[in-house]
Amino acid sequence: MRFSRVALTCLCGFLGLTILACSRPGGASKKVAFVTNNAADFWTIARKGCEQADRELADVEVEFKIPSDGTAGEQRRIVDDLLAKGIGGIAISPVDPANQTQMINEIAKQVLVITQDSDAPQSDRACYLGTDNVAAGRQAGELIKEALPQGGRVMVFVGKIDARNAQERYQGIKETLQGSKVEIIDVRSDDTDRVRAKSNVADTLVKYPDVAGLVGLWSYNGPAILNAVRDAGKIGQVKIICFDEEDETLAGVKDGAVYATVVQQPYEFGYQSVHLLAKLLGGDRSVIPANKQKIIPTLIIKHDNVDEFTAKINRLRGRG
């Protein structure tokens, strides 16, 4: 089924963005939803994957939900709205897995639930689909050591350190840096506030003038770091390692301001989540691995492969 009509609805009171697939003649027998954890550009690519899966599956209708303020409370309101509409399956990236486990368990008693991007392993979700974030953190850790062969002090930035994907990436980084000459000063969180994300970096550059590296764990942290470093006139003096494929991050990799970025494959998050939900709703449980995890591998983007990767991402974003 095609996303032949796309509606952007600003929900009063909590500004949740909703992108709806229109119903095909006669109605779809499987209604599923993909719920993000914030409004980052990262999810634009995931939406393309959802749209492609929706086109391929004749009996599926997909709703794509974006909690613009990135809170667990807004995710709950979105889910309640989906349940009221009679949704059959939900793929959600929980903002705060530990404190949302009960919510996920309640939902799982009513409809099929999988987690994507950020897992809640203690919940009753049917499966997790996404990155092995510990492994991705280890990749970032190796890049930090590579960028700082003489060692140095680094600061880590993230939206919410309580999010499982953030915790696991940080765990992987710490494991890899253990015993090295690199010292982690601390982790600064911004609660998905982009202005605060940049000010956290600016404050760090002032408070720790000897800082050698800045690490961003979430997609928008890369541009926040880059812009703060540029404003401080320290491009080239501080090594930047980040995650995901924001435009500014990729441009920074191309011009050398960003050493490298570890990218996920959000298109596959969307595409495979919809297909997985459709198969499970059709009664096929064989698609769930024994460990209940479907891992989508991460990629390392550096100066030598950034042009090719950027061209691919731009195609997915509909830019050419």
Q: Where are the predicted features?
A:
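Short, low-complexity disordered leader/linker segments with a strong preference
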Residues: 1-31, 105-109, 319-320
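Hinge/cleft segment of the Venus flytrap/periplasmic-binding protein
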Residues: 22, 157, 161, 165, ...
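Hydrophobic alpha-helical segments within soluble ligand-binding/sensing domains
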Residues: 27, 75, 129-154, 196-198, ...
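Extracytoplasmic "Venus flytrap"
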Residues: 31-57, 63-77, 87, 93-97, ...
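Short, solvent-exposed amphipathic alpha-helices that sit
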Residues: 42-56, 60, 136-140, 164-182, ...
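Hydrophobic alpha-helical
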Residues: 91-107, 173, 185, 191-252
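Flexible loop/hinge segments that line or gate small-molecule binding clefts
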Residues: 97-135, 143-146, 153, 244-254, ...
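Flexible loop/turn connectors
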Residues: 235-236, 243-301
